[in-house]
Amino acid sequence: FHSYLQKHSIPLESVMSKVWNKKIFKHIQENVDQASKDLADERGPCPDAADYGYNERFSNKTAIAPTASISIICGGASPGVEPIAANSYTHKTLSGSFNVRNRYLIKLLEKHGKNTEEVWSGITTNQGSVSHLDFLTDLEKNVFKTAFELDQKWIIELSGDRTPYISQAQSINLFVAADIHKRELHKIHFDAWKKGLKSLYY
């Protein structure tokens, strides 16, 4: 989801991200609902649904799983609905360590004529952030904010907005400082509960 927003220059902390969030997950849910009905017509409803008079093939249809490993295999896409933790980081494997760079940021840096090792070294040193790059506009910096730079209320807000379109649950991670005040931490959890989230991770 975050990769999609970055590709289209949409900050995660924006009304447009809310619009696309609802549009995407409503589209998925509507199509899954239709597929369940179509398969029920073709092969019969599942026993649980049939017992209650519903013509549905599936009783549970959608969930958002943690997809950290899959996102790396898919060329560095953002993991599920989770924001990207860093625009540049070192990925360690059994084969060795290698630098992973945000592919949409690469294109933006090329546009500015700044896709250099020096710039990438600065991004890596700055915990994957682009906030120190004075040649980027405020919009561009907002588009490429890392998970730790984002106001976590937006993660809760977006998660709550997509909840009606998910039949099971979402894997939602929050990115907070180790020294976060307990009052703020309680507020985040309370806001998540008020928005109808079933769970939070880490």
Regions found by a protein language model. Name each.
Residues 5-67, 138-141:
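Internal maturation/activation junctions in enzymes
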Residues 1-13, 81, 130-136:
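Short, compositionally biased low-complexity segments
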Residues 3-6, 10, 26-45, 107-115, ...:
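Generic secondary-structure signature for well-ordered alpha-helical cores
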Residues 62-202:
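Catalytic alpha/beta core of large soluble enzyme barrels
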